[in-house]
Amino acid sequence: MVLTAGDKANVKTVWSKVGSHLEEYGSETLERLFIVYPSTKTYFPHFDLHHDSAQVRAHGRKVLSALGEAVNHIDDIPGALSKLSDLHAQTLRVDPVNFKLLNLCFVVVVGRHHPTILTPEVHVSLDKFLSAVATALTSKYR
């Protein structure tokens, strides 16, 4: 899916709200992921997965920082996330479906905190962007 200029502008608008809340929104996204899709916990056997865990907060910040890199390099998402794709495909061996599940949880978090900006048009743009991120992250699985 190609991101239009309008999609890119919409994603950057969302990120202008999210970017200053990386740890908060990131940990909330992960907590939702673990609750709604409990099988995703298997990738974090060494983490304290309780609410407000320092490990979940730190990893949430990492996850959203990576999304921020994708936003900052929106015209070259695969290039921006290449090393992360290698890590997840070759070392961590994360099932690619989990990126889609994480994306769903992230959209819920954005909508919960910023309901007025998540219009149908912005939602579509964000979905397209997150799909491009998931595609980039799974590109090294072959």
Swiss-Prot record:
InterPro entries: Globin, Globin-like_sf, Globin/Proto, Hemoglobin_a-typ, Hemoglobin_oxygen_transport, Hemoglobin_pi. Red blood cells. Residues 2-142 form the Globin domain. Pfam families: Globin. It comes from the Eukaryota. Keywords: Heme, Iron, Metal-binding, Oxygen transport, Transport. One of its GO terms (biological process) is hydrogen peroxide catabolic process. One of its GO terms (cellular component) is hemoglobin complex. GO terms for molecular function: haptoglobin binding; heme binding; iron ion binding; organic acid binding; oxygen binding; oxygen carrier activity; peroxidase activity. Heme b binds at H59, H88. Heterotetramer of two alpha-A chains and two beta chains. Involved in oxygen transport from the lung to the various peripheral tissues. Belongs to the globin family. This is Hemoglobin subunit alpha-A. It comes from Chelonoidis niger (Galapagos giant tortoise). The gene is HBAA.
